[in-house]
């Protein structure tokens, strides 16, 4: 794995651990999930983001874990993009989920090639 890919992995991991923590522990994210009509999934989503971010870091040492973490996070962000479209959010609101989906799909592709 190249240094550039490692940087993408670490950046994605930091973003997911940070954002997942916000989802779990802040009122603003509680309101967002209510707006999405997905309040009952807020804790699970936050936990998956934090665990996925941690999995990306472990995946730097274990490619199999990187495949699972990046694949799961790419799928989670696909659902995030679909949700943003469904509630008619604009590009600015949708772009973070879209960018993280693409980044993790890229990580997944690299990890699969390394197996």
Residue spans for each PLM region:
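Membrane-interface extramembranous regions
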Residues: 1-115
């Amino acid at each position: 794995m190249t240094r550039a890919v490692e940087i993408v992995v670490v950046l994605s991991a930091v973003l997911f651990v940070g954002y997942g923590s916000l989802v779990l522990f802040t009122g603003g994210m509680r309101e967002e999930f209510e707006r999405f009509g997905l309040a009952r999934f807020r804790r699970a989503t936050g936990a998956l983001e934090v665990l996925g971010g941690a999995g990306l870091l472990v995946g730097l040492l274990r490619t199999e874990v990187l495949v699972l973490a990046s694949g799961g996070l790419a799928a989670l962000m696909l659902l995030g993009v679909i949700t943003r479209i469904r509630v008619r959010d604009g590009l600015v609101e949708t772009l973070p989920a879209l960018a993280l989906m693409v980044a993790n799909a890229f990580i997944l592709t690299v990890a699969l090639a390394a197996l």
